[in-house]
């Protein structure tokens, strides 16, 4: 009976057999998409040669679809409570595998549209745009001319049917949509706590297992932003008749090399560059901010535009009081782990048009990017590196490891911090490095059952010199003969090769996981 119950979802009328997704799910293996010309030109994630460490490949999806088509495996959709516990866990594993397959299928139409946008706008694919730091040079250039910024959380639908409705525009195959609804319904029976008012938190912290929900949520966000940008173009139509945008490669999926981490970037950073400089929009980690130049009334209007759009078009509840409006000159904006604000003392740039002509003084406010010291200390406290007031303590859980491993772990943390917060003053990180350095010494002293003073006297102070030499190693690659290189030693440095250290922006798992970073 179970087989007959669910078999109707796999029976498609002949008129639907020409649909795009039908041969992928029911007739052919999914690896046929690797031969699609449009996907291969830009290096699609589907055609990457993934290794064993990635734990997922097209071969796994191929086997999954083959097993789905076998009659004996229709019983995986059954949720009989009398089944053995081991079999129920096996069913959950099947649902997770189906989720990965559905995410791959649903992503294809969206990826094709993104590739067409690249071709139409003649955007050259740049590896630097994949870096988390790539947005900060843009902010330095644009926010210095703006006055106000509005920040808040993007509301999310409380019912998963809204996510299914959002994907209808991209997928015309009704059988796939029915299968998607069936998947949601059956999985909610396995985990009654899944569908709750914490949907967005669930999506953030269950990145690897439930990629289908990540795909659907990204499509839902894309629909929101499409209407927002349409309204924006109508408002600024007389100022700019054409609006171009720069869409990062990690907008919809994270990195091509990491298929298992397709949505590990948690919706990624979306950077839209408008010709009109009076409004800029950015989205990150389920949050947004609007920056504008002019009076507070203008940014307030956009705030209520967003609220009405969410409530009237997408039927999601948004609280206007949770959307904050601040002045850039008086308040700092917490953005991707930095506290960004405009400096109180504007810089003066003196320019001269031609020789022997008069000089022109131009004033420009400088964007200050500071490190949230108290947030980092709080994260260190949760990771058991220090107490509430910032006094270093030993790490007992690491005391059983070899001395070299303990030192390497602490040095790795300092390197991550130095790389990510290279855009701020190096003096600001000294306190954090000091805490980690003493925590390392206390951990080693605890292991050898000695005091910190005796341990350092016996081994010498040069034991931990690696903690403060990372920046010198990087900057030593730049010759110091020119005046430009001299300024690099004093100014901020943005690394455009940080592709996967997203935990740094939220201070979660920062001190346990080393980011995937290419060599500088």
UniProtKB/Swiss-Prot annotation:
The keyword Amino-acid biosynthesis does not apply. It comes from the Eukaryota. The keyword RNA-binding applies. It is found in: Plastid, Chloroplast. GO terms for biological process: mRNA processing; RNA splicing; tRNA processing. Belongs to the intron maturase 2 family. MatK subfamily. This is Maturase K.
């Amino acid at each position: 009976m179970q087989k007959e119950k669910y078999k109707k979802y796999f029976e498609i009328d002949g008129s639907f057999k020409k649909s795009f997704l039908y041969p992928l799910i029911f007739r052919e293996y999914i690896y046929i998409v690797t031969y699609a010309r449009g996907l291969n030109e830009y290096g699609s994630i589907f055609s990457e040669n993934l290794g064993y460490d990635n734990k997922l490949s097209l071969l796994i999806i191929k086997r999954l679809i083959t097993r789905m088509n076998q009659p004996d495996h229709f019983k995986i959709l059954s949720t009989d409570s009398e089944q053995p516990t081991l079999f129920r866990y096996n069913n959950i594993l099947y649902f997770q595998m189906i989720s990965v397959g559905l995410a791959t299928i649903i992503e294809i139409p969206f990826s094709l549209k993104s590739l067409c946008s690249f071709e139409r706008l003649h955007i050259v694919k740049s590896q630097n745009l994949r870096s988390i730091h790539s947005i900060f040079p843009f902010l330095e250039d644009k926010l210095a001319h703006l006055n106000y910024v509005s920040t808040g959380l993007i509301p999310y639908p409380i019912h998963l049917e809204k996510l299914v409705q959002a994907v209808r525009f991209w997928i015309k195959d009704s059988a796939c949509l029915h299968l998607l609804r069936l998947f949601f319904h059956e999985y909610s029976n396995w985990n009654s706590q899944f569908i709750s008012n914490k949907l967005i938190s669930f999506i953030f912290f269950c990145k690897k297992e439930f990629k289908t929900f990540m795909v659907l949520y990204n499509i839902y966000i894309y629909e929101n932003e499409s209407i927002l940008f349409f309204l924006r173009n109508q408002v600024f139509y007389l100022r700019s008749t054409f609006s171009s945008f720069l869409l990062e490669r990690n907008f919809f999926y994270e990195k091509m090399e990491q298929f298992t981490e397709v949505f590990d970037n948690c919706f990624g950073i979306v950077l839209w560059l408008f010709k009109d400089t009076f409004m800029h929009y950015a989205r990150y980690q389920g949050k947004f901010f609007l920056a504008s130049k002019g009076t507070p009334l203008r940014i307030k209007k956009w705030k209520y535009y967003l609220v009405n759009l969410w409530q009237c078009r997408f039927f999601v509840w948004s609280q206007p009081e949770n959307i904050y409006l601040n002045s850039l000159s008086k308040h700092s904006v917490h953005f991707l782990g930095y506290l960004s604000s405009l400096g109180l003392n504007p810089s003066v740039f003196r320019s001269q048009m031609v020789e022997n002509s008069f000089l022109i003084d131009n004033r420009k406010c400088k964007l200050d990017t500071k490190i949230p010291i108290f947030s980092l200390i709080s994260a260190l406290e949760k990771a058991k590196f220090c107490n509430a007031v910032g006094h270093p303590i030993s790490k007992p859980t690491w005391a059983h490891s070899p001395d070299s491993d303990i030192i390497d772990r602490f040095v790795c943390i300092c390197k991550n911090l130095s790389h990510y917060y290279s855009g701020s003053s190096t003096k600001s990180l000294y306190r954090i490095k000091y805490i980690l350095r003493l925590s390392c010494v206390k951990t080693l002293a605890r292991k050898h059952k000695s005091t910190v003073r005796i341990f350092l006297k016996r081994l010498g102070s040069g034991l931990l010199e690696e903690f403060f030499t990372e920046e010198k190693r990087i900057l030593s690659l730049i010759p110091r003969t020119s005046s430009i290189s001299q300024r690099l030693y004093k100014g901020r440095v943005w690394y455009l090769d940080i592709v996967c250290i997203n935990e740094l922006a939220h201070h979660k798992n920062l001190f346990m996981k080393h980011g995937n970073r290419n060599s500088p």
